[in-house]
């Protein structure tokens, strides 16, 4: 089978390349070359203490690592990002590093007011930790189910949670509290994006609500495609119906 192109799959908060296991198998079976880089300090055993340097790792550090990775390829790939990975894909697209970008339930860039009661509750376990923006943080099980994993069958929630690692408190602050970040690390120059972009929201998402994805699409401006998956939460990478959603998503893209 001839290779149709290269997809760089960018995982989200607390995750790793395993997030894309199902998507990669599906897309590779249809001729795509799928690459799954792991964000800095995320290639870790969830049972081990996190690297303390993770706590102050910036979105800009993640983006710089991914930029170096992509520049080592033969040409600009399609970027497929989930959650924070969707925001990183947007940042990279604005740097001219994407042939196209698909953003699944993406985190929002600076300038988008996305805080809702559900978002605040989703991050509450992080926000209550003293100086959370300087330490590695991880959601508790109940918080993760509320924010991310609620659309999974009950029997899959704990095994999925047990694979989650710590995340950078700084990166979380740069997204959720962008208005307090003097560097605006989550800033995206929408005018610099020269490739097709598809944004996908989920109707029942609490972590990156459909309302926030719509605001992000409006912020980016005309020319970007927006779709919404019904009856689905944040974990679009593995919840029931993921195969049908991805197949439909690829046809629309």
Enumerate the language-model features and the residues they cover:
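Flexible "cap/lid" loop of the alpha/beta hydrolase fold
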Residues: 97-134, 171-180
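Helix-rich cap/lid subdomain of alpha/beta-hydrolase
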Residues: 118-162, 171
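Short beta-strand/loop motif that positions the catalytic acidic residue
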Residues: 193, 199-201, 205
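Catalytic active-site module of serine/aspartate enzymes centered on a nucleophile-bearing elbow/loop
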Residues: 223-253
């Amino acid at each position: 089978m001839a290779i149709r192109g290269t997809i760089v799959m960018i995982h989200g908060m607390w995750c790793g390349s395993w997030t894309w296991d199902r998507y990669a198998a599906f897309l590779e079976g249809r001729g795509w070359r799928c690459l799954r880089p792991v964000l800095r300090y995320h290639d870790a055993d969830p049972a081990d203490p996190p690297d303390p340097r993770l706590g102050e790792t910036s979105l800009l550090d993640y983006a710089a690592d991914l930029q170096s990775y992509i520049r080592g390829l033969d040409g600009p790939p399609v970027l497929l990002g989930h959650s924070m990975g969707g925001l990183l894909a947007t940042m990279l697209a604005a740097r001219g590093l994407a042939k196209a970008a698909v953003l699944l339930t993406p985190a929002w860039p600076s300038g988008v007011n996305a805080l809702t009661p559900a978002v605040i509750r989703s991050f509450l376990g992080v926000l209550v930790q003293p100086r959370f923006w300087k330490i590695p943080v991880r959601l508790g099980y109940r918080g993760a189910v509320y924010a991310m994993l609620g659309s999974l069958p009950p029997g899959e929630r704990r095994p999925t949670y047990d694979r989650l690692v710590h995340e950078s408190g700084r990166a979380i602050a740069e997204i959720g509290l962008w208005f307090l970040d003097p560097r605006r690390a989550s800033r995206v120059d929408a005018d610099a994006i020269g490739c097709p972009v598809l944004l996908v929201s989920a109707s029942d998402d609490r972590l990156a609500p459909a309302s926030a994805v719509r605001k992000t699409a409006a912020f980016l401006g005309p020319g970007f495609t927006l779709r919404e998956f019904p009856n689905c939460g944040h974990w679009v990478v593995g919840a029931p119906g993921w195969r049908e959603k991805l197949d439909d998503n690829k046809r629309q893209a």
